[in-house]
Amino acid sequence: MKKRQALLIGGRYRRPLAGVSAYIDAWGTFLCSSMGGCWRDDEVWDLSSWTVDDIRAAIKSARDNFYTMVIFAGHGEVRKDQYGFLRTYAWLNDDVAMSEHELNPGSERATLIMDCCRKVQLQLINESMEKYALDELVLNGVDTRKVYENELDMCETGFVKVYAADIGQSATDDESFSRTLIEGLRDAYVHGNMGRVVNIRDAVNLAGRILPPQQTPVYNGGRRLKHYPFAINPLVYE
């Protein structure tokens, strides 16, 4: 069986960052929904309360997965690493930051999403996740998990990265990248503006059209012909 795994990491600080836990919960709900590809509960790990050493071990152990997603929400910054390369760093807590290089699980297919927000207006999006009940009403037996895995099979291997904002930008106070990415896509589905399978590149581009112009999300997928799936539209059949 092809093993997939999602590692969710919410930054934990002495002064908690409003909204982080809600966004991590929302990612879990989205991934396990029909639209998110029907991930199983045991494939989605919330590492937010884990020690830094345990988080590092979990990322390392994901190396042999068929597909891994690492999703971080919290404080972040861009600075040069020891070799002089600009890297985005995720602050796991007030004292420890991990670079995007360290967050790479090394599995043959992997996606890193860094929702590095400095201030977030608290808006518990998990309350709106009731809307995903729509999935179960319209699926009529369509196996979106299988559709998702078929899409992964057709993709080239490699590590892709998604950033909530471009270098020099910060996430806005009024918008959350996670919220925009998930809810914006669902609304586009309902209004018939997207096809059956939406890949990560197109999902990020959609979020970029919704977010204010001061915040430009970035997708770094390298030179690939086919991008990893992000969502399956339960309203479209083939």
Which functions belong to the PLM regions below?
Residues 1-238:
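Cysteine endopeptidase catalytic domains of the caspase/legumain-like
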